[in-house]
Amino acid sequence: MQQSVRKLFGTDGVRGRANFEPMTVETTVLLGKAVARVLREGRSGKHRVVVGKDTRLSGYMFENALIAGLNSMGIETLVLGPIPTPGVAFITRAYRADAGIMISASHNPYRDNGIKIFSLEGFKISDVLEQRIETMVSEADFGPLPEDHAVGKNKRVIDAMGRYVEFVKATFPKGRTLKGLKIVLDCAHGASYKVAPSVFEELDAEVICYGCEPTGININEHCGALFPQVIQKAVIEHQAHLGIALDGDGDRIIMVDEKGHIVDGDMILSICAGDLKKRSALPHNRVVATIMTNFGVLKYLEGLGLQVFTSPVGDRHVLHAMLEHEVTLGGEQSGHMIFLDYNTTGDGIVSALQVLRIMIESESMLSDLTAPIVKSPQTLINVAVREKIPLETIPLIERTLRDVQDALGPSGRILLRYSGTENICRVMVEGHKKHQVDCLAKALADVIDAELGTGSRE
């Protein structure tokens, strides 16, 4: 019998509202079966799959559904419980598992959930493999089922969080500590709520925690990397040295300096790239940024003598460009930072430790490290839309786009794109004059809102 589902995989795995397709228990069971069949086709013998999740209420039912699908096909599951996405990638490699699966909708609200699949090397699986899995799910064709003792079992990995904490700490220089540093930390009530405080406290920092009390329905709710205002205020209030905000699954980071100024992924990339080049630790003097990267940041990186490759937005695309061009450092404005010397996916805590190391070794405040980087005026507005109609098919939007580009001139740029994980149109305008950029971005966002919007924007 065919299972009728809409397209499963988006730009970052499967994602959607819990109990609505594609994020239903029924489809999740089929997804587990499809992953199992792909693994069984790859080689014979017993197979193991690591399963982690964030703190969403719906994580329990999807964890059980996924495990049921995998076990029914003879796969042994190693169950981690709540752990950051990069922790799943690490444990998959450490346990020599055949695959890793993270149940999370990343920065989305609690009502959403998702599934990210990692290969045995800890990389997100390819588009080709995703398509193969999707075809199996839609056709519900999984081949013969194992019988009797051949069905799979699940095993809870008791020390998974502790192992990941030790792995992350090992990316910080031996013999160094964070003693004397006061850090405001916001874990978005998400997967990092235990791991991140443990890492920084065990390295002897004074940690002031926000977003570390998950209820299942408060993940990302006015906190974390999407709401850095929380740590901006707290850093000033507590006279902290810096603030660190993670998203719901811990794979992205936004920082705040001691003055309360936001340090986004563009700035973190610049700081770390400059340090690595100075230490001759950046192969080929190359980095990967994205099409959203601020023009001023690109000029700064090129001024350091670095070759900058740009990819589409999304950590999958950043990683693909890194592997293609033999690059070990890449990142995007939203805070996904990939240090291939340490992990195979974005890792917010590892990224924070690299910046902290640079601060300590250079005896600098975070604001000192960002001072040489002059960003171009840039405005980003997120417009909630009813549906993702191709923008070029809407005449008024096309006319407004041309008018805005004419007003900006040849040195300005506009980027319009739909989010790959939410019904949002992102409007980015960049130029030389902040007031003009703000006004033009608002004008363009207003037209998109009038044509497609729900009346909500950020």
UniProtKB/Swiss-Prot annotation:
It catalyses: alpha-D-glucosamine 1-phosphate = D-glucosamine 6-phosphate. GO terms for molecular function: magnesium ion binding; phosphoglucosamine mutase activity; phosphomannomutase activity. Coiled coil: none annotated. The active site is at residue 106. The lineage of its organism: Bacteria, Pseudomonadati, Chlamydiota, Chlamydiia, Chlamydiales. Catalyzes the conversion of glucosamine-6-phosphate to glucosamine-1-phosphate. Transmembrane segments: none annotated. PROSITE patterns: PGM_PMM. GO terms for cellular component: cytosol. PANTHER family: PHOSPHOGLUCOMUTASE (ALPHA-D-GLUCOSE-1,6-BISPHOSPHATE-DEPENDENT), PHOSPHOHEXOSE MUTASE. It comes from Chlamydia pneumoniae. Binds 1 Mg(2+) ion per subunit. This is Phosphoglucosamine mutase. Keywords: Isomerase, Magnesium, Metal-binding, Phosphoprotein. Its EC number is 5.4.2.10.
